[in-house]
């Protein structure tokens, strides 16, 4: 018999302790992983609702189970808000993740063995854009494009490779690139060879929704995103298009269900609906502009302190600190900063001589600190502390001093005030 007063603390104290410890970690650590963010209590309320009990295979109005009249309302709200947010005429909000959204696009548009042009993972791409260890690299013939010596996407190389290999699909988007992508140029190249243009905007979806980064939806045949990261919603995925192609939309829907998934997670879709509504508010635009402002402020300090930033700066929410030539690996930098309650991730940089498990760089992003209320002043102060540690990563006194400063700053800017 279920009762409303059932709780984890009494029933499963071991699990409850882990949850409490993670909650404390989030409050007492500065989160700089570019793909992480804090979602709102409203989103978490939706995810913790009784919608989690409902199976709803199919799509609104076309379900395989009864009793779906209310979850149809929930999913329709999410769909319509996603379309409004990004200027799309089609949205599928069922993908459980960004990677599953991407796999659905591959399934809808390609056959195994087809040629795909995607950004090199070592140059800032994503696993699902053709990495040999991922389904994309195993099932398809991947031709990687990259960045030039300035750290910017090399569109001349992209066009040359496209003309030479004639891929059926080109992929735009990234996981560690700090520049602006020219979506119109990519579409021009795709049209030249008769290829689909697929954009994975997961990292910059929030910036795009707020109008502070170019929107790929008018240019691409299909666009995917996660719903967390800069969008600050629940962990999940979404597929969008403005191609006005009903045949394409049917292929995409079929590739999600029944092609790759069964029942959608209705409680997560409710969380997506809330997040999309939040992203339509004026304050969301203010937040996203501050995300970019904070990233630029951090880059300024890194450069002043003599650190190299891949591409020399940032136009979005992230930066890649290049440690090649320094007596410090990305793994060591990650660990040293972590000891001071600053969370980053080690990351490969272009022409990295070290393995992906060690790396010669760290990736840093500003969505989470901006969500806490950091502005340029705090971002610059924090970057100075990071440089202090990177300058002397084996010095416990420096790490302990910075940790104290971090704890004081976190106390001033609680995640959930």
Curated annotation (Swiss-Prot):
The cofactor named in the record is: pyridoxal 5'-phosphate
Q: Which residues carry this modification: N6-(pyridoxal phosphate)lysine?
A: 229
**Enzyme Commission number:** 2.1.2.1
Q: What domain of life?
A: Bacteria
Q: Which residues bind (6S)-5,6,7,8-tetrahydrofolate?
A: 121, 125-127, 355-357
Localization of this protein: Cytoplasm
Listed GO MF terms: glycine hydroxymethyltransferase activity; pyridoxal phosphate binding
Q: Which UniProt keywords apply?
A: Amino-acid biosynthesis, Cytoplasm, One-carbon metabolism, Pyridoxal phosphate, Transferase
Enumerate the catalysed reactions.
(6R)-5,10-methylene-5,6,7,8-tetrahydrofolate + glycine + H2O = (6S)-5,6,7,8-tetrahydrofolate + L-serine
Q: In which pathway does it act?
A: One-carbon metabolism; tetrahydrofolate interconversion; Amino-acid biosynthesis; glycine biosynthesis; glycine from L-serine: step 1/1
InterPro entries membership: PyrdxlP-dep_Trfase, PyrdxlP-dep_Trfase_major, PyrdxlP-dep_Trfase_small, Ser_HO-MeTrfase, Ser_HO-MeTrfase-like, Ser_HO-MeTrfase_PLP_BS, SHMT-like_dom
Q: Its quaternary structure?
A: Homodimer.
PANTHER family under this entry? Answer: SERINE HYDROXYMETHYLTRANSFERASE
Recorded protein name is: Serine hydroxymethyltransferase
Q: Which gene encodes it?
A: glyA
